């Protein structure tokens, strides 16, 4: 009986927050929008329409600026700093955001005012993968109105010389779904003989659960982790970059290096981004965001 009273008290407290537009009571018991199958189908349709993305870096070495978990609401100091640093970089470069761009509903316009990516095109060099906060509350249609696709690949080259393959996976639900897994296997098999230096997969949800920072959403189901790590190891993937944990992590397994990076969210305890120096080898720096006195 005591447990029932506690449960009712929690429900009453949540219902009392009904005017909060970021609280979706129905979403506690039902899906938060289109399933990964639908998002995958939408993404494939867009990818087929715009064609493949091949980026000529003009040289063999270049830089990848990478951030995660900016959780934009009305505060975007760190994300603005990241974009400013990226734009000031004079070396050949691309940038990747590893998801949870926004914190809750109605924040995409605010985030895009910083990214200035509205109506993303294949000429852009800033790439995004969705996080759970970007998809929750039935926001997929809004997300894709800005960023168009959540599952895609691109590669880099120096003229006719192929360099590196990047693959973006949609793990916003903490799963990939059968269609996306099969697409990944087919893509890796098709590219196996193309001679890439590095194959880098990037996605939001980290594959390895090293803490409970994100509760039950921390990573994939055990069966999915086993399947994905087997595929990634089998087809020669070198790195998997992720976020979601809000803390830096590194795991090496079956020939693949799995990396999670710190958060870009303002006021987070771990505030840093990653600069990957891509060449025959990859080295990493983790600059902190500037501290702001209270």
Per-segment meaning from a language model:
Residues 2-9:
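Sec-dependent signal peptide recognition
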Residues 13-16:
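C-terminal motif of bacterial Sec signal peptides marking the signal peptidase cleavage site
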Residues 18-109:
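N-terminal active-site segment of His-dependent metallophosphoesterases
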Residues 21-43, 248-294:
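Binuclear metal-dependent phosphoesterase catalytic core
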Residues 52-65, 153-167, 195-198, 252-258, ...:
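Beta-strand-turn-beta hairpins that frame and shape the catalytic cleft
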Residues 69, 99-100, 131-132, 204, ...:
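Active-site glycine-centered loops adjacent to acidic/histidine catalytic or metal-binding residues
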Residues 78-156:
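Core catalytic region of metal-dependent phosphoesterases/phosphodiesterases
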Residues 85-94, 121, 175-258, 282-285, ...:
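His/acidic metal-ligating clusters that form di-metal
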